[in-house]
Swiss-Prot record:
Stated name of the protein: Anthranilate synthase component 2
Binding positions for L-glutamine per the UniProt entry: 52-54, 83, 129-130
EC number(s) recorded for this UniProt protein: 4.1.3.27
Gene name as annotated: trpG
Pathway(s) annotated for this protein in UniProt: Amino-acid biosynthesis; L-tryptophan biosynthesis; L-tryptophan from chorismate: step 1/5
Organism this protein belongs to: Acinetobacter baylyi (strain ATCC 33305 / BD413 / ADP1)
Amino acid sequence: MLLMIDNYDSFTYNIVQYFGELNQDVKVVRNDQVTLEDIERWQPKYLVVGPGPCSPTEAGISIPAIHHFAGRIPLLGVCLGHQAIGQAFGGNIIRAKTVMHGRLSDMYHTDKGIFSNLPSPFSATRYHSLVIEQESLPECLEVTCWTNQNDGSIEEIMGVKHKTLPVEGVQFHPESILSQHGHQIFKNFLEIYA
């Protein structure tokens, strides 16, 4: 079973549908209606921390779940869930240079983890005003996806991967209809961490 932490976001069930199309039995729980003990009892095979309209600090059980289950259950964070991963491991969450609501950006990546065998760049939809700060990125996390500035340097972090644990995050929305390769990103997560 794949457990999805719903951070009260309208995209939650798009993610659920994508994972359902990948033959996953998905259980959805709201971030303020579940305990760590509940999750332990359910014994999910995967844990997905979903998007939401707030900051990671306001995302209920999201950060405690990351702290508790990182290294025990493969974990994927999407948008707010990605930010929660950054914060849970010691990074700062800051305002993005530009608020991105329903805007497409080119995603450049390392071809590692969930981005394996995808073209670089590819186009993905962004809905966020916060990002993981590059300068405070924890040593245990590596940048796997980013947007470029005009000079080719990293503009903003769009994906992270823990260096030793089965934990990855994406800032953009793979499940958005305009995002390319969304199914493949989720499929890669399931296959890599099976």
